[in-house]
């Protein structure tokens, strides 16, 4: 089946199998490897991308579901002016180590900052619950996001 979508601001038209996952489409068909495969059950957040501005787990989202949508991967976010702010905050607060979770984390945080939902420490924790990090212990991540959101 043919799908047409925008990926990181570029129009893409491709044939996909009905069962092809968005994660596989991005990685295998488009060579965008920032979204990572890890749990395959929407738990870890490593595969997070934005579809029409909202974070989705691309490991459980069909490529066909993205037909007509705007998909943003970490590669696309890195081209945006706001990426530098995210990168600086995560670096300043030592919010990353191995980096495996970082693309999904940054995409989630970007969408949440844009929505204005991050107004308390508890809200930050709730919103990041779908993004697991095995290295940092979360303190630096929570500090970076609080800094970005202006939450004390």
Q: Where does each model-flagged region fall?
A:
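Signature of N-terminal electron-transfer/Fe-S-associated modules in redox systems
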Residues: 1-152
């Amino acid at each position: 089946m043919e799908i047409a979508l925008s990926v990181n601001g570029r129009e893409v038209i491709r044939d996909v199998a009905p069962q092809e996952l968005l994660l596989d489409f991005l990685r295998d068909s488009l060579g965008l490897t920032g979204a990572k495969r890890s749990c395959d059950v929407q738990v870890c957040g490593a595969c997070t991308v934005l579809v029409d501005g909202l974070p989705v787990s691309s490991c459980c989202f069909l490529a066909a579901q993205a037909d007509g949508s705007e998909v943003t991967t970490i590669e696309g976010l890195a081209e945006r002016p706001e990426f530098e702010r995210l990168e600086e905050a995560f670096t300043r607060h030592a919010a990353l180590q191995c980096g495996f979770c970082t693309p999904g984390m940054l995409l989630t945080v970007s969408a949440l900052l844009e929505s204005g939902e991050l107004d308390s420490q508890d809200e930050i924790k709730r919103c990041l619950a779908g993004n697991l990090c095995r290295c940092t212990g979360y303190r630096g991540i929570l500090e970076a996001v609080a800094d970005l959101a202006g939450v004390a």
